[in-house]
From Swiss-Prot:
Its main location: nucleus. InterPro entries: Cullin, Cullin_CS, Cullin_homology, Cullin_homology_sf, Cullin_N, Cullin_neddylation_domain, Cullin_repeat-like_dom_sf, WH-like_DNA-bd_sf. Keywords: Abscisic acid signaling pathway, Isopeptide bond, Nucleus, Ubl conjugation, Ubl conjugation pathway. Disruption phenotype: Small plants with mishaped cotyledons and leaves. Reduction of the number and the size of lateral roots. Increased sensitivity to sugar, cytokinin and abscisic acid (ABA). Early flowering under short day (SD) conditions. Residues 1-43 are annotated as: Disordered. Belongs to the cullin family. Residues 11-23 have a biased composition (Low complexity). This is Cullin-4.
Amino acid sequence: MSLPTKRSTFSAASASDDSSYSSPPMKKAKNDLHHSPQHPNTADKVVGFHMEEDPTPAAANLSRKKATLPQPTKKFVIKLNKAKPTLPTNFEENTWEKLQSAIRAIFLKKKISFDLESLYQAVDNLCLHKLDGKLYDQIEKECEEHISAALQSLVGQNTDLTVFLSRVEKCWQDFCDQMLMIRSIALTLDRKYVIQNPNVRSLWEMGLQLFRKHLSLAPEVEQRTVKGLLSMIEKERLAEAVNRTLLSHLLKMFTALGIYMESFEKPFLEGTSEFYAAEGMKYMQQSDVPEYLKHVEGRLHEENERCILYIDAVTRKPLITTVERQLLERHILVVLEKGFTTLMDGRRTEDLQRMQTLFSRVNALESLRQALSSYVRKTGQKIVMDEEKDKDMVQSLLDFKASLDIIWEESFYKNESFGNTIKDSFEHLINLRQNRPAELIAKFLDEKLRAGNKGTSEEELESVLEKVLVLFRFIQGKDVFEAFYKKDLAKRLLLGKSASIDAEKSMISKLKTECGSQFTNKLEGMFKDIELSKEINESFKQSSQARTKLPSGIEMSVHVLTTGYWPTYPPMDVKLPHELNVYQDIFKEFYLSKYSGRRLMWQNSLGHCVLKADFSKGKKELAVSLFQAVVLMLFNDAMKLSFEDIKDSTSIEDKELRRTLQSLACGKVRVLQKNPKGRDVEDGDEFEFNDEFAAPLYRIKVNAIQMKETVEENTSTTERVFQDRQYQIDAAIVRIMKTRKVLSHTLLITELFQQLKFPIKPADLKKRIESLIDREYLEREKSNPQIYNYLA
């Protein structure tokens, strides 16, 4: 584009103006105050341009070998004399009269006599000629007069609150519409005057300030509005239908005016607190806990929805907190005392989940955790301490633990603190009766691992073992469990009564993982003995002694047991039939020839046999203990024998013989008849072979009463455990003192508690220390009896 001529440049400069704001395009007015539109590049008062003296084309310069230096240019400066336009007579008064008429028409909801474009231009013209400040004040005055009158019209109205609120809403909506219309006309005022004067409010803010001012001057209107809003909200809480749109509009009015917090929120929260305080007391008395918790959950949902629909979001947190405080915090203890035990007993997982969720909202989970701990301990104590139900104790504990696990997972969301509470409480309750739970858990496992559990699959048995292992973890006296478990395992292995060898080994593997190899060393040794015994028996059958010396018609299998692995069995004398004595002697000869230097001792009380018997109604096989077999074989030579005759012939210890005869003559399978009849065997009783015995099965198991655990046997097992504990305590004391040489009583007791894995009382430890002093392993410091010295 070529440079403009001097004339065109001058024209552009003369068209410039001091105003920095542009106005909408419009036609030229009659008073000639409107200027032509400005050119965007001619706003400067001084326009400079230059001309080159040698206008040689650029192409010619490029063709030269050496470029010439730039030639100096001549600069022309043109100064402009701007003519200031003059205002027509009464311009300001006429323009304001026009605008005032329009503003009043807007407030009176009448038709405006002028088109909006001309009104906009009128405001623009006033601003252009520095009359914007006065115009702002005039508009503010008009607005104030109207707003004051509008709000005063609401004073003294004795209408229904809902009608009154509708009128307030109408007043507010009219105000908003009117202020927006006025702002659209006076937009130039907002864009220029307000921006240039930071202390001046926009027209909208000015209107809000006036509305707020005159609302405060009409306190009756504000107070009735707040009262009406609170009344409507309370009605809605009481399940009455209300106009939520009206509520929303009026609350937005309070927010827009900046009086929401002071005028509405404060009384609203106070009223909410009073409402729910009364409701909480009423419902707590009338409802059970599940219903009450559902009600609280519903109320919290309602209030949250209320905040979404019409209450300002800023109120949500204090509102929900108020509801939680009045419906939950105030009633935590009552809820727990009144309903927690019922919910736990009924396994009400959904209601417990609701309780946990609600309690977490008010930081009351610690109270819930304590209630859970108390419940577990009290309920478990009833199970453990009821001696009449010892038979069902373990199964009851398993069922109780299973239900707690379900509640923990489904209701308490696997909360770690709650899980630890259940574990700690279970450990407490299961050790309330010293040693007995450990013994019963071992017995329970014996029942499950014993052959005869029909309908139990390998998977089900494995699941039971896992669950029992959980109880085992809680036991403090694991040595008691080991003693009884080992005794029962021995019977299962020796009598061939294990339901599954794989299950037996699986359980030992679990115990090994739980307690270490030292705990299961003897149990594993028992299995090794059984496996080795099978090999020894096979080798014996192939030996020359067996082929040439064994009596015919008898098959015999021997378990060779390592004394250190197996329980201690008291020796019991018995006169065996000649055939069995021969068999034992031949086997002993074979074994000692193979394993020289060893010693065999027969435990006849553990033997069992299968006898073939001829009855008048058919042949039968009788599965009996060795003692029962010895007694029955006497009747091959006599039809009737007295108690004394049998005792002399067998040499069985008196109590054991009475139990044996009782099982043969007084039990379900009566292969002997006792005279006189009765449940107990007395001196002088006579026994004869029951030739008329009949049974549907060919092989019959005669319950061996003497093989059932007696009170004496239980006591003996427990005493052995206590004796072993004393040895362990003595060894621990000597081990510690040998390392420390000198130690105080308090520190010694502390270290013993750390090292010993079974429960022990300080008084018992003191007795063991005294015993070691008597045996000269330790001595007291002469100057201080509380100090012990180790004696090498």
